[in-house]
């Protein structure tokens, strides 16, 4: 239990640090942009609620089937979860893009045109990268369920580094759009790392299903 719980706790802590760094970068653009970014982040969190739920389910699923020695079920379950990621990401992206202006209004009363534009800039960029975000939840939790907690923990460090690097590199030439891209870059790099790690673990440490 500790081998799963400790990496999860560290990941949440690292993610919180990354969020604070990102918020600090946004603060320099003024109160209206800060309000827009905060509201857009809340909208994104609402739109992606299926992803952490799916991830938690996969952690339990992989752990139970690993303990039972049913590796074929792990393969099938993770394959199905991979395809579910497309559905979850597509639904989240559509919700952010189509209902984004209305949902931003839930958190900002009568937002100005500038504020709404800034919020939608973040949501449009985030929507493009919802798929790797879904991968993070599924494969990070799946690997932890398979008692492979090191890489999921290190993936949090990569996520933090990616955000910080994009903020340093892209903020000056691209301004607020560069800051909005920090989450997207973190999701993409971390999602790819976790998929590659799962593929390596599944084909080197698990018994391949017979056909």
Positions of the model-derived regions?
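Small-residue-rich hydrophobic transmembrane alpha-helices
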Residues: 36-94, 98-100, 133-155
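Hydrophobic faces of transmembrane alpha-helices in multi-pass small-molecule transporters and flippases
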Residues: 1-21, 46, 50, 54, ...
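Helix-terminus/linker motif at the lipid-water interface of multi-pass membrane proteins
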Residues: 13-42, 46, 64, 102-112, ...
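Hydrophobic/aromatic residues in alpha-helical transmembrane segments
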Residues: 18, 22, 58, 99-100, ...
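Short runs within selected transmembrane alpha-helices of multi-pass transporters and secretion channels
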Residues: 55, 126-145, 151-163, 179-195
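Short alpha-helical transmembrane segments in multi-pass integral membrane proteins
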Residues: 1-6, 62-129, 170-206
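Transmembrane alpha-helical segments of integral membrane proteins
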Residues: 163-169
């Amino acid at each position: 239990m500790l081998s799963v719980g400790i990496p999860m706790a560290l990941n949440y802590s690292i993610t919180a640090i990354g969020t604070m760094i990102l918020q600090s970068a946004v603060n320099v653009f003024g109160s209206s942009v800060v309000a827009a970014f905060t509201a857009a982040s809340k909208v994104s969190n609402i739109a992606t609620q299926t992803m952490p739920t799916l991830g938690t389910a996969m952690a339990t699923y992989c752990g139970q089937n690993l303990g039972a020695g049913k590796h074929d079920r792990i393969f099938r379950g993770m394959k199905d979860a991979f395809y579910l990621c497309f559905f979850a990401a597509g639904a989240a992206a559509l919700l952010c893009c189509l209902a984004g202006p209305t949902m931003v209004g839930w958190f900002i009363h009568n937002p100005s045109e500038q504020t709404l534009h800034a919020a939608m800039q973040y949501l449009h960029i985030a929507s493009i990268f919802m798929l790797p975000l879904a991968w993070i939840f599924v494969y990070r939790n799946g690997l932890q369920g398979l008692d492979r907690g090191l890489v999921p923990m290190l993936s949090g460090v990569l996520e933090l580094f990616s955000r910080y690097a994009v903020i340093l590199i892209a903020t000056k030439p691209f301004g607020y759009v560069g800051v909005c891209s920090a989450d997207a870059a973190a999701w993409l790099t971390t999602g790819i790392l976790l998929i590659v790690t799962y593929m390596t673990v599944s084909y080197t440490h698990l018994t391949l299903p017979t056909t």
